[in-house]
Regions:
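Intrinsically disordered, low-complexity and often Lys/Arg-enriched segments
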Residues: 1-5
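Charged interaction scaffolds used for protein-protein
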Residues: 6-13, 20
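N-terminal core-binding DNA-recognition domain of tyrosine recombinases/integrases
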Residues: 7-10, 25-112
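Short alpha-helical hairpin
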Residues: 15-27
């Protein structure tokens, strides 16, 4: 069963970094004001929340300057051949990449 948007939004407050929480809330408002569908909002928020959890308490989105920081997160989505013989993980990897790029290029750059 897919996660509802309200459930995803409630997870923002429990992130380990308050700066990232605030940026994700602003990103959500940005998507709403641009008329994004709830499904699009939900999927983007889930990806960005997962990345924020990966960054932990000491790193904010504003501190992310190297592509290697994003790549190390994306590489957690890679599965070995025994787990995923059809290499379906590539779709997940690309989906997260697209959503994180959207977050950084479409929204965060305007904030900086």
């Amino acid at each position: 069963m897919p996660t509802k948007l309200t459930t995803t939004i409630s997870k923002i407050a429990s992130l380990p970094n308050s700066t990232n929480s605030a940026l994700i809330n602003e990103f959500h408002q940005y998507m709403k004001s641009n008329g994004a569908s709830e499904r699009h909002q939900n999927n983007n928020l889930k990806a960005v929340i997962a990345f924020a959890n990966f960054l932990g308490t000491d790193t904010t989105f504003l501190d992310v300057q190297l592509k290697e920081q994003i790549m190390s997160f994306l590489d957690t989505k890679i599965k070995n051949v025994q787990e995923d013989p059809d290499k379906k993980w590539i779709t997940t990897w690309n989906d997260y990449l697209h959503r994180i790029k959207h977050f950084f290029s479409g929204f965060t750059i305007r904030k900086m």
